[in-house]
Amino acid sequence: WSSGHGRSGERMSDDSARLEWDGGVLEGAYPVRLPVWWARRGEAGPHPDLPGVSGRFIVLRHPKRFLRFEGVLARMLKGPKELRRTLDDMNSLLWELCDGHRDFEVICGLLNETFHERIDPAVERAEAALRQLNTLGFLAFSREEFEDHWPTGPGIDPSGELEVPRDSALDST
């Protein structure tokens, strides 16, 4: 279940190893956010009335990883040191629902109730999005409900490499 490798291929410690789901549909999986900096922005869109779920857009930030030559070029050209990924409304809600306390079936049901035909087929679309977030190293799958082994909330910089955001529209609390 554990790949043991991070976003850029470096070996991760055992307590932060990305969990992988071994094939098939994600039935019974508990998707859980890994420690990554994220925040909310914008007005609330459609969302279920649940704790920790706002319906706002989610912005993910993580340090850019460069090869030696790319790093030299980035410093010379003063390129950005981080990547920002703003999720759309459906993926933002999916992100907020992935706290490790809801299983895949519950999440799909909530997405379907919220977005109706916009997200059809909900199971396939949710699975594709979750697998992509897993591949990027932002999310893991557990066979059991998450026991809060690591922080999953907004504003956490596990790398210690990100600058404090100057964008006042980002809510990382």
For every predicted segment, state its role.
Residues W1-L34, M76-T173:
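Long, charge-rich, low-complexity alpha-helical segments
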